[in-house]
Amino acid sequence: MIPRKRYGSKNTDQGVYLGLSKTQVLSPATAISSSSDSTPLPTPVALVPSPPDTMSCRDRTQEFQSACKSLQSRQNGIQTSKPALHAARQCSEFTLMARRIGKDLSNTFAKLEKLTILAKRKSLFDDKAVEIEELTYIIKQDINSLNKQIAQLQDFVRAKGSQSGRHLQTHSNTIVVSLQSKLASMSNDFKSVLEVRTENLKQQRNRREQFSRAPVSALPLAPNNLGGGPIILGAESRASRDVAIDMMDPRTSQQLQLIDEQDSYIQSRADTMQNIESTIVELGSIFQQLAHMVKEQEETIQRIDENVLGAQLDVEAAHSEILKYFQSVTSNRWLMVKIFLILIVFFIIFVVFLA
């Protein structure tokens, strides 16, 4: 048997392992002969199996209970803060609505300024009637929309007034009143601009009629005859009239065309003035609505003023009662004597019995 060479073992002779390999199995006779010939082998060391891995247990009941308590307290905090969140949400909705109305008011003011510049022009040849009519229609629609938005905002304040605080309701009412006043001033400016436009249209019409009206003497008269002599025969008179009518046809057609143009221009200006008058009437209805809303706010302010006056009267009455009580206390000398005697008695008791 050829022994196998192994390295790194202390039981080897010059690095050669003389024993059996792990894959070889000895018979009993061979084991006896080998044990008698060679040195005795060391006794095998029994390998103790390693204990199985055991998971360490730790009581975490307290941690679980503390986590449950913290979660429960967090849920209770959320439930208690729901009214505050609801009030904040309502305040944010009101702020967004008021901001939107303010932005629309500023845009409408810019359009009104442009309309004012165009309406104050008095030139006959630089009259932008189409642009003025478009701006008038747009501003009228914007004013109607703003009026509806402010009414919705006021309804929102009324609906949420009982749920919000007194100071928040007062602040909301103040904002609504300021928006209403801005809309009223803008409507008044729009009405004045329309009145200026109406006056300018009247002046333009008068000037156009003055310059376009031709006197009767300036109109060319049809001649009675071609030769200037008296006409005896009816055929010659008819022929002369035919010739005269043929000669006057171009001028007559031009005058008729000018009359048609004047009629169309006057009709367009009449339509424009009618639109302006209808717009002024609509603005009057908007003013009535704003006056009604301001009247309601005035009643609210009057109630607040009455409450303030009542509180002031109560404070003055309480102040007078306190002054009376103070005068009665200061005038009562026996009370001062009694207090002094009580202090002396307590001092004597303290010195005699406790010292």
UniProtKB/Swiss-Prot annotation:
Keywords: Coiled coil, Golgi apparatus, Membrane, Transmembrane, Transmembrane helix, Transport. InterPro entries: SNARE, Syntaxin, Syntaxin-5_N, Syntaxin/epimorphin_CS, T_SNARE_dom. Residues 263-325 form the t-SNARE coiled-coil homology domain. One of its GO terms (cellular component) is cytosol. GO terms for molecular function: SNAP receptor activity. Pfam families: SNARE, Syntaxin-5_N. Residues 355 are vesicular. Part of a ternary complex containing STX5A, NSFL1C and VCP. Part of a unique SNARE complex composed of the Golgi SNAREs GOSR1, GOSR2, YKT6 and VTI1A. Component of a SNARE complex consisting of STX5, YKT6, GOSR1 and BET1L. Interacts with BET1L. Interacts with BET1. Interacts with COG4. Interacts with GM130/GOLGA2. Interacts (via IxM motif) with SEC24C and SEC24D; mediates STX5 packaging into COPII-coated vesicles. Interacts with VLDLR; this interaction mediates VLDLR translocation from the endoplasmic reticulum to the plasma membrane. This is Syntaxin-5.
